[in-house]
Amino acid sequence: MLNAAAADRNKDPILSVLKSRVASNRRLFALEISSGTGQHVVHFAKAFPNITWQPSEVETQSLSSIEAYRQYHRLQNVQPPIYLDVSQSWQTWGGFPAESCDLIININMMHISPLACTTGLFHGVGQILKPQGLLLTYGPYAFNGSIVPQSNFDFDQSLRYRNPEWGLRDASFLTTLGQENGLRLEEIVDMPANNKCLLFRKDSVV
């Protein structure tokens, strides 16, 4: 099993956001896109036994780690991880029908992937999220062209140096991208270490 220190640090703050906004008294289906090591999905699944959780990844090593966490924790409400390339058409995302997911989570992906992954994420989520369903994204973001504090600005510069296609995405751009795909930015939640949770609600009509 892989272990990411950042996942250990942020899993409880993100869980707190979920607990105050996601129902715990009815059956739901949640897709985590870019599940990483698998630490998040098992943590959330323990807190929400009413939700069937579907982890996904594009990296083979991560898929193996997710399955190892799933087996270790013996959680009946976590499905085996699936391969999902978010830059590809949503029809390739494991065969999910349109409007089949109550909740979709995407943690720390957008700033370390090409822009095509971000646009693909919003396009696909707009298709497979149920009306009034919730998309939660987490990470560092720019706001109206500005990146603060300095540590986030430096982080963005280091990412772009490593890969020109990486970098912090602007929340205003994501708001527009969401609107184009029937997703309304409902809330921005301040998180530790200068991160944010962006909560998008799918409107009834796309």
UniProtKB/Swiss-Prot annotation:
What are the cysteine partners in each disulfide bond?
none
Q: Read off the InterPro entries from this record.
A: DUF938 (IPR010342), SAM-dependent_MTases_sf (IPR029063)
Per the UniProt record, one Pfam family is DUF938
Checking SUPFAM superfamilies in the record gives: S-adenosyl-L-methionine-dependent methyltransferases
Q: Which family does it belong to?
A: Belongs to the UPF0585 family.
Q: What is this protein called?
A: Methyltransferase-like 26
